[in-house]
Amino acid sequence: MNYGEKAPALWDAIKNEEKRQEDTIELIASENIVSDAVREAQGSVLTNKYAEGYPGKRYYGGCQYIDQVEQLAIDYAKKLFNAEYANVQPHSGSQANMTVYNALLKPGDTILGMGMDAGGHLTHGSKVNFSGKIFNSVSYDLNPETEELDFEKIRQIALENKPKLIIAGASAYSRIIDWQKFREIADEVGAYLMVDMAHIAGLVATGAHPSPIPVADVVTTTTHKTLRGPRGGMILSNNKKLGKKIDSALFPGTQGGPLEHVIAAKAQAFYEDLQPEFSTYIEQVVKNAQAMADEFKKSENIRVVSGGTDNHLMIVDITKTGVTGKDAQNLLDSVNITTNKESIPGDTRSPFITSGLRIGTPAITSRGFKENDAREVARIIIKVLDNPEDKDVLTEAKSSVKSLVDKHQIK
């Protein structure tokens, strides 16, 4: 075998995945479609280079161009979010959160985050995650009537438990979040406030959602999802003193060598996000989500949690269809619509089964879908879930999906 010879089975799988993406309507809220330039940066020769440390302070030689790349990513990120400090080295959103915890907390400290069935993330204190094992985690839920954040209840929980860190942000919440109310609660109990804006970072960057940067002590995010970049993480703050603690908590505290090829891809994505067209894109993402939510609300058997959406996603309660979230995910997969099962507030089913679906519009909007297309996708989903065993309905749905993906091909 020659050095560099492609492994046939591997490249067959990659080609098949490329075809799957082309042929599928992608509605997973955390997924998107990156530009060729982002992919090219991530596949560049930077993958060959070790660069422990930070720009100008490396443990290896030969980092002069690596320093330029990482500094560009930092500068673009700071400009994009109007932040004083940015660390672009976290390998993921989870690593970004872990780094902040390591910088601000000690094992056993109390943290307060959104519960999983309310829309929180594993790293916000789930008992099966490091965040719930290393720290004393307490959770807040949603108001059962409005299915929105209940700040008076959150305040009561904070006063009772005196957390050292309050975590705002979610992985499945469709409404605008009032960062200032979280700040007031944090100040009242003497806690740090961390915002995890992984899902809504693109909306924050364009002003479609209020920014947490001026309010929170520290903000974490992923760089994919609505930012349309490579899979990775980032930490932002306006507190430079805190930034120094975070830098050392990340390296050498949490990670070793940064993935500079991914950081290059982050820089390219941030550059794209700074262009006027990105604001137009995010505006369309929200319009598409709201169009889908409005269509779902016409259904007798599908209920939109909280009654609608202000961002890129929605949670739908499909209990009345008689189909579980797990079965709905598989059923929609069979007609080339990709979603993910999701717990609804107060769900009695396990997270592996669920009574709902999480649906997002970043990827279809990157393909050029507009409101009418989004409504049509919602109608297809409604018909499939109302007729899960009707083969004619499933065949028709698959044909409708093909028409939409042929109309809006991945560029």
Swiss-Prot record:
Which keywords are on file for this protein?
Amino-acid biosynthesis, Cytoplasm, One-carbon metabolism, Pyridoxal phosphate, Transferase
State any GO BP term from the record: tetrahydrofolate interconversion
As for subcellular location, the record says: Cytoplasm
Site positions (Plays an important role in substrate specificity): H224
This entry carries the following GO cellular component terms, namely: cytosol
Q: How does it assemble?
A: Homodimer.
Its annotated function is as follows: Catalyzes the reversible interconversion of serine and glycine with tetrahydrofolate (THF) serving as the one-carbon carrier. This reaction serves as the major source of one-carbon groups required for the biosynthesis of purines, thymidylate, methionine, and other important biomolecules. Also exhibits THF-independent aldolase activity toward beta-hydroxyamino acids, producing glycine and aldehydes, via a retro-aldol mechanism.
Q: Which family does it belong to?
A: Belongs to the SHMT family.
Protein name per Swiss-Prot or TrEMBL:
Serine hydroxymethyltransferase
Organism source for this protein?
Lactobacillus gasseri (strain ATCC 33323 / DSM 20243 / BCRC 14619 / CIP 102991 / JCM 1131 / KCTC 3163 / NCIMB 11718 / NCTC 13722 / AM63)
